Amino acid sequence: MQPRHPVRLTATLCLLLASLATFAGAQDKPPAVDESLRFAIIGDSGTGSSSQYRVAEKLIASRSSFPYEFVLMMGDNLYGNENPSAYQKKFERPYKLLLDSGIKFYASLGNHDEPNQRFYKPFNMSGERYYTFKPKGNVRVFALDSNYVDQKQLEWLEKELKASGSDWKIAFFHHPVYSSGGRHGSDEMLRAQLEPLFLKYGVDAVFQGHEHFYERIKPQKGIYYFISGGAAKLREGNIQKTDLTAKAFDTGYHFMLIELTKDKLNFQAISDLGKVIDSGSLPRFSDEQKKAFAGDAALPAPKPTATTGRNK
């Protein structure tokens, strides 16, 4: 007996074979990879106080829902004594679970830090006051020493920025070039030294500490600036009303979580009580937009003077 619907069966068989071929071809390709980069930020953290440990607990707990790959330190990593027991109390003990799980910390030097911290292996500074690393293919991170910005550091920074072909260029250091803080405020000399290079070579975001609060600055010439200096120190009520502030928080301690996708910077600032105090998704400015913002970047950065060193 002949099949009742030979044409229909033949068509069905062809579709099935085509589907199997497509599936086999898809299996030859590697699975989709999450190209985003996640990291955390702490600043002015090294006190050994209960506030540092409280922030550290929330930082550790957040990794279960936000699996960050490393932590950037904004300076003032160790206040006061820096003997071996101080390193244990102010760094190794509060962040032990992260260190044991292989999370790397990358430090910058603050005004309360001894330069010899750069030789402490868990800070991953490789013995340098300033350095750069590439955590993922489209991201390059630049750690600077804002305590003393000499011509050698500026020349190094320009060379590294120029050589970087990364889409995302992230800088971090201690002293803020834009700030609404009543104690310190914006470091205009540092801004005059660094901003022309940031503009010329398309830096996307800058993270800083020193001010013991959280502040997200309104975009400045196509660059996003954040102050995150409250991981163990707090200067309550210190933020002044200025036109710089997009969001500010000076009534509690905090840390930050950052995610970089192909074209967005997603962020959260989280208090020591686990409350999200600021969050958002910021678009990466295009190369064309950056070139437009860099109109004044051709001006040479001022050379450092005897007052360039910062110890306040």
Predicted features and spans:
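A short C-terminal boundary segment appended to hydrolase-like catalytic domains
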Residues: 248-312
